[in-house]
């Protein structure tokens, strides 16, 4: 049943026996017809992967009264789907139902909503049903009709009611399901988030109810209830998810901009000594920023409150940390606090990571649990930076072998927390973090030429271990679900091509940003001043190893991730901040302060 727009979860919860939640209508803002097609094909990708936009579709009555999409229009839909480096099959749900001898139909008021049940040939109910057989139908209705149908349902009847798409920007659709076993707050393994499911989960839900196996090309998962209906919780969840994207610029971007301006003012007002102090506080604040965002997710304050937590709280706490643990030690403490906070959260499964402003932004429709691209870039850089800074601050005389062991241990622990599907669910963490650690270890041990083969071996071993862990623990991560369970390693080519296209798109998008070109200027400056930067680290070889490892992890993430430009900017900023600390503390023998303790 497709209900009028603006129907609420609270209204659906008033229907007897109906479980409720919110439905992600697509990846980003998509037209209604795309949402309906996604339901029918059981898979969805970002609009940028398609060759062209979706044409306007009509569902008309054909010969014998059979509803269908005109062949030219359906041909355009199939051709558009074939252009995507993924297994997208428009009409898959309708064809699967027909092959199982299920009667498929649509009411006269269904309109384009019938696209959800159109088969692969663009027709509705093309296969006949002989004798008694199940029926799956779609139609438009109002809330009163839903109440009436829910009251008359019995046995294995299933009534699915969704708000008519598209939803308002940065919002989701209200969803209700009535039937035996669905009275509760809805969820699915696609999101692992109570109260939030995907459009691609509807098809598997219908098929599971009918006892029909889900086709391998469907990526959605069956919807199920999780606890009693909790309208207040669902509404609060929707509100918080809707705030994540819009708040990123004012809370994160403006705060960092203010910090940079204050750093420049300190340099002008207090010259060399002021810049030393300001750069160290800036780096520590940047390292603490993600941890402050996790606190914001827990407290769910107003936008002003979150800006104060980040914009004021981070520098104040950074200054306190640096007073207690000056120089590289303070940077290590701040980096460790952020990495540890998110590791504990994803392992505990509290979902604060998903609700934080640096989390995966579930309402965007791409990732719904674990860490997103922003956190992947942050963690991949902070792990080697923090490890190197800790060694330089607390164990400056550690042997190369001991330092290498430390880098290896922190990398293994970080991958164990952020890569498996049961925790951080980010395969990129199994690539970037091991590469960063391998480079740091190589510098600590002074390896030459063939010794750098471990830079290649480390991520391969980590990904292999990740697959084994997910299969053993039932992590059901994207890697195992889409590659091993749905066609084997042959799908890796499609995934690689898809990531390259999305990464190229991200560079094209960020190329219009002034911040992007500032970061590029920082990178170019760093390359031209490489020897001078190395000199600022001086005898602190472990800090230098951590810095270079962070650069390697950032480069690996940029090449392997579908948001390459974003990872490049985040990693480059954190690496530049580390250089700032190295410069600020490299003269500590001549000018000791409480920011940089004198060498004994």
Protein language model regions, located:
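Membrane-interface capping segments at transmembrane-helix boundaries
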Residues: 269-271, 394-398, 448-450, 528-536, ...
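Aromatic-rich transmembrane-lumenal/periplasmic boundary elements in polytopic membrane proteins
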Residues: 332-360, 365, 454-456, 460-490
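Short aromatic-rich membrane-water interface segments that cap or initiate transmembrane helices
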Residues: 241-252, 360-382, 422, 484-515
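Soluble extramembrane regions of membrane proteins in the secretory/endomembrane system
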Residues: 1-246
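Membrane-interfacial loop-to-transmembrane alpha-helix junctions, especially the N-terminal start
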Residues: 227-229, 272-288, 326-338, 399-408, ...
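Core alpha-helical transmembrane segments of integral membrane proteins
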Residues: 235-363, 372-396
């Amino acid at each position: 049943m497709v209900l009028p727009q603006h129907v609420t979860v609270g209204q659906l919860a008033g229907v007897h026996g109906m479980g409720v939640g919110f439905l992600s209508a697509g990846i980003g803002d998509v037209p209604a017809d795309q949402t309906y097609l996604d339901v029918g094909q059981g898979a969805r990708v970002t609009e940028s992967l398609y060759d062209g936009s979706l044409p306007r579709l009509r569902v008309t009555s054909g010969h014998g009264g059979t509803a269908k999409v005109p062949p030219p229009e359906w041909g355009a839909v199939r051709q558009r789907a074939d252009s995507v480096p993924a297994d997208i099959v428009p009409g898959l749900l309708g064809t699967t139902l027909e092959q199982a001898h299920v009667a498929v139909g649509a009411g006269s008021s269904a309109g384009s909503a019938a696209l959800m049940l159109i088969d692969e040939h663009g027709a509705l109910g093309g296969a006949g049903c002989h004798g008694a057989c199940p029926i799956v139908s779609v139609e438009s209705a109002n809330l009163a009709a839903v109440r009436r149908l829910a009251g008359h349902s019995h046995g294995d009847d299933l009534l699915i009611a969704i708000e008519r798409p598209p939803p308002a920007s940065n919002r989701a659709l209200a969803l209700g399901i009535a039937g035996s076993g669905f009275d509760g707050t809805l969820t699915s393994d696609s999101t692992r988030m109570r109260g939030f499911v995907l459009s691609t989960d509807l098809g598997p839900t219908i098929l599971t109810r009918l006892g029909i196996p889900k086709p391998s090309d469907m990526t959605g998962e069956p919807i199920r209830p999780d606890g009693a209906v909790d309208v207040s919780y669902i509404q609060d969840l929707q509100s918080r998810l809707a705030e994540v994207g819009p708040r990123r610029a004012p809370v994160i971007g403006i705060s960092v901009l203010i910090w940079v301006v204050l750093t420049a003012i300190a340099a002008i007002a207090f010259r060399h000594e002021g810049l030393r102090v300001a750069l160290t506080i800036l780096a520590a604040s940047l390292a603490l920023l993600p941890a402050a965002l996790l606190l914001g997710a827990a407290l769910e304050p107003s936008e002003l409150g979150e800006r104060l937590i980040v914009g004021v709280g981070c520098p104040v706490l950074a200054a306190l940390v640096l007073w207690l643990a000056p120089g590289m030690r303070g940077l290590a403490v701040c980096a460790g606090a952020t990495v540890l906070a998110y590791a504990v959260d994803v392992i505990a499964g509290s979902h604060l990571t998903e609700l934080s402003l640096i989390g995966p932004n579930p309402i965007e429709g791409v990732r719904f649990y674990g860490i997103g691209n922003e956190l992947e870039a942050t963690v991949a850089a902070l792990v080697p930076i923090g490890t190197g800074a800790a060694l330089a601050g607390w164990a400056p005389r550690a042997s190369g072998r001991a330092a290498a062991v430390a880098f290896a241990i922190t990398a293994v622990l970080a991958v164990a927390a952020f890569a498996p599907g049961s925790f951080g669910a980010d395969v990129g963490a199994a690539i970037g973090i091991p590469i960063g650690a391998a480079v740091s270890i190589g510098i600590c041990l002074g390896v030459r030429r063939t010794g750098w083969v471990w830079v290649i071996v480390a991520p391969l071993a980590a990904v292999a271990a990740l697959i084994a862990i997910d299969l053993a623990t039932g992590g059901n991560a994207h890697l195992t679900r889409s590659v091993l369970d749905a066609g084997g390693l042959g799908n890796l080519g499609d995934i690689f091509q898809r990531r390259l296209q999305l990464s190229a798109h991200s560079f094209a998008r960020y190329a219009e940003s002034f911040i992007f070109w500032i970061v590029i200027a920082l990178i170019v400056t760093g390359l031209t001043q490489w020897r001078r930067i190395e000199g600022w680290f001086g005898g602190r070889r472990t800090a230098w190893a951590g810095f270079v490892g962070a650069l390697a992890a950032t480069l690996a993430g940029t090449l392997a991730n579908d948001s390459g430009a974003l990872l490049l900017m985040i990693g480059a900023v954190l690496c530049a901040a580390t250089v700032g600390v190295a410069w600020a503390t490299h003269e500590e023998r001549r000018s000791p302060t409480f920011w940089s303790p004198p060498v004994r």
